[in-house]
Amino acid sequence: WAFSLATDYNPNCRILSMPFIGNLATTRLGLDPLAALVAATRNPSTTLDDPDVTGTIVERGRADINILWSESVDGWCQTPGENPVITTIIAGSIVNVNE
């Protein structure tokens, strides 16, 4: 069963931080950091109902990728106050580099 993690930004819940949501999922719900990352990235892409467009890394794929700063998968959600993304690639082109 694939499930998704997301923020629910609204007037009563002003959270925009996916690392914070991942941190809650791992520390409060006991999810493995990799499972939380999949629930925040791959699983939501399945709702687009087009596996050829996004959500997978495959030859001749679209190549929308965020590259994270940590050497371990745990890093993306264990520092919820920091941006874990160092590079963003959309359609194979680098569009953002955080230093």
Spell out what each predicted region is:
Residues 1-68:
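His/Asp/Glu-enriched, well-ordered alpha-helical/loop segment
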Residues 42, 46, 59-99:
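C-terminal cap of metal-dependent C-N hydrolases
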